[in-house]
Amino acid sequence: ANLYDNIAQNELTKYRWGFARKKAQLALTTIIPVDDEYSSVYQLPSDLLALTTIRPNGNYQLYGDKVHTNFNGALTADYQFNTPESEWPAYFAKMMEYALAKDFATSIRDSSSSRQEMSSEYAIASRMARFTDSQQHPQTAIAHQPFIEVRR
């Protein structure tokens, strides 16, 4: 991957962007685990950048692009995916401009003050992008309440 792709993928995984989320049912593979710690192996999606959640909740371990678990049923993953530029909202695209400017400022202008200026602009654009993105998605209520349940 080139430097641009690395910066874009890094920015896509820094925050749980709503436009970059996916949910997928994982495919059970025919791979037999090496030891008896896990009984099943599932394939992760090819466009996955960062895994958020595996459902149903349970004991699992990631090995490369596979999920090893003792669960043997329908397994779903919530994850951040490698979103094409054409699907980026304007607020994220603008933030990416500043991320690129920050990373390339020194080599283009040979000026540390230029890098500091772009870093400052990036920080502002990043805050605004996260705020805008968060306004588009409802808050998820906490389903598990161990401190309340222990008192019952």
Residue ranges: model-predicted function:
Residues A1-R152:
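Glycine-enriched, solvent-exposed interface loops adjoining structured elements
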